[in-house]
Amino acid sequence: RNIKVSLQDLDFSTKNGYVKGIENIFIKQLEDLKPTERPIHCSDKKRLQFYVKDDDTWKKDEDHEKLTESIKAVSNIQVKKMTVWEKQNPDYTKDPQKSYKWSKMLDSVIAGENSQEVKKNEKKIKKILGKVVDIKEELKGN
């Protein structure tokens, strides 16, 4: 499914940071879908065991390869969305307030300063998503 990112999402990330921003985007997209339509489910939120629907087939996401790929994709979409903001604020390089906002935005869409920080942030996102797409909770609700 194509993930959409709005300027409001980018603003949310700027105010709340990378992890909360990515969580917000995923959760908004998933909440729009019925549990049976979601492309991802978590069968064990403690061990973070995810199943991903790929080419109409459910597959165990062994090393979180697909989920990590999706997190990076959302981050990249946010970076691209910054260009929309830049076009709407062409004076951002000259206006100190806008320049500051731009740098805060950039900080909020980058996963981390090093691979250790990136992995730590990805794990936080996966834990939250595990709770959101927990198939056991969904089955209890029906």
Locate predicted features.
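Extended amphipathic coiled-coil helices
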Residues: 1-142
